[in-house]
């Protein structure tokens, strides 16, 4: 259990393969049992210990949960609401929604937060290679959409 949590909480997106390896470790330990599973546990523990570290997603989910607790009274923006009935459509549910998969790179500039939370940033990437690359990709997409 602790290896799974360490892979996600302490390593996170700096090395997403760590979570895959930890999950396979968990399954393998159950399949093999003691005493041989100590080898599997050791391999996984060393991999995690020597992997790049990042807790940025851990911090982001905590920040998001705290924000949700404080702002749960705010309504979901109308354009994000499903409109399964005629009345909901008439009330503007789903109007002006932009389906990201209809746009280049499956990305579109669109507000997903209530207006009161506009410009709220929940995720701050760590300064590791993988997260910096992801941040650059997002910045490039935003810039392309703003042109």
Language-model segments: what does each one mean?
Residues 1-107, 111-147:
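Terminal-proximal interaction/regulatory segments of ATP-powered molecular machines
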């Amino acid at each position: 259990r602790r290896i799974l949590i360490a892979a996600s909480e302490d390593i996170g997106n700096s090395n997403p393969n760590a979570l895959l390896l930890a999950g396979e470790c968990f399954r393998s330990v159950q399949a093999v049992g003691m005493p041989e599973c100590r080898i599997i546990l050791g391999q996984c523990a060393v991999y995690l210990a020597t992997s790049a570290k990042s807790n940025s997603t851990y911090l982001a989910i905590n920040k998001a949960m705290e924000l949700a607790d404080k702002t749960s009274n705010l309504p979901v923006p109308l354009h994000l609401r499903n409109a399964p009935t005629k009345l909901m459509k008439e009330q503007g549910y789903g109007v002006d929604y932009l389906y990201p998969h209809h746009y280049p790179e499956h990305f579109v500039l669109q507000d997903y937060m209530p207006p009161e939370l506009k410009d709220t940033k929940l995720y701050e990437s760590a300064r590791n290679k993988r997260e910096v690359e992801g941040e650059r990709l997002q910045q490039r997409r935003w810039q392309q959409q703003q042109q």
